[in-house]
Amino acid sequence: SNMSDAAFNAEWGGWRYPFWISIVLVGVSIYIRMKMSESPMFSKLKAEGKTSVNPLKESFRNKANFKMVLLALFGAVMGQGVIWYTGQFYAQSFLENTCKVDFEQSRTLMLIAIAFATPFFILWGWLSDKIGRKWIMMVGMALAIFTYRPIFQTFLDDTKYEVPGNISPKNLDIHTSLLSGTQDSLLISTSNYVLPDGKKFQTIQTDTVFYNSGQLSIGKINIINKVLPKATYWKFVGLIFLMILYVTMVYGPIAAFLVEMFPTKIRYTSMSLPYHIGNGVFGGLVPFIGLLLSTTYKADPLVGLWYPIGVAVLCLIIGALYLRNKIDRNIKD
């Protein structure tokens, strides 16, 4: 956002910088993968010739094992998936699109909350070694179920102020740039307002100036960005932190939990299906279904939350009733 149009669209720079930097990450990733080896237990099975000939068949056609696959999906991972996506992606989308929070503020408050919450992945993983995985994940789901709507309602309440029509902007910035391949210009007018109670907001209006006629386009794009006061900003950081804390509770123990559910020779195959469906399908659909519900039932801005809450409720019931909370389980089978 601090780059000029020319710098942003430079042939070898600008928007390409993140992709150039990612080359380093690709190199690190390749190096790590080249140094990785099979787990000691799987290596032992392989040396003894006891690996599965058809892991797909053993995982999904064996009724007892397939039951565990389904239990892992519907009793743990689908809840973990929707809580992950709601606490981060849906929350950010809600702040920007529904609450109209300033783009840069929403990004920075998310980053701060994530930074503070990240160590809790390790904490809950460590604690699950001591007291078991199940109830840490179940408590995380329960907390999310009962607090999502109050948290998102707070987002709405603290950003619910209309843009007045009788107030002059504190400052006005007008920027023009040529549209690529034409002689027409894009006119961007940014106005910053401060309300009597200290609340701030910004409007961005874009118009097209046609070269031939010298006239403005009829169509306009108006963007309203609400700039959060300092107290509200940190309040939102705390609420986002709380939701990501739920993420750490359900996600921190999940890898060890899945490993402990399946025998070594078909472990990776068996745990892959519930993990990827739980996150990719149930979790991945949170933004889409949330938006679909919000546009269909416009009277309730929070209606999109019923999908992740409903999935988490179902997962909590199944997990609480049917999952076992084993500690220090021998996984050498």
Q: How would you name each of these model-derived features?
A:
Residues 2-21, 221-231, 294-310:
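A membrane-interface helix-boundary motif in multi-pass transporters
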Residues 29-36, 147-158, 310-333:
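Multi-pass alpha-helical transporter architecture, strongest
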Residues 34-57, 332-333:
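Flexible cytoplasmic inter-helical loops of multi-pass small-molecule transporters
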Residues 65-114, 152, 183-194, 201-203, ...:
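Extracytoplasmic gate region of multi-pass secondary transporters
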Residues 121-131:
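Helix-to-loop junctions at the C-terminal end of transmembrane segments
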Residues 130-141:
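Cytoplasmic membrane-interface "Motif A"-like loop-to-helix N-cap segments
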Residues 152-238:
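Low-complexity, proline/glycine-enriched hydrophobic segments characteristic of transmembrane helices
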Residues 265-295:
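A late C-terminal transmembrane helix in Major Facilitator Superfamily
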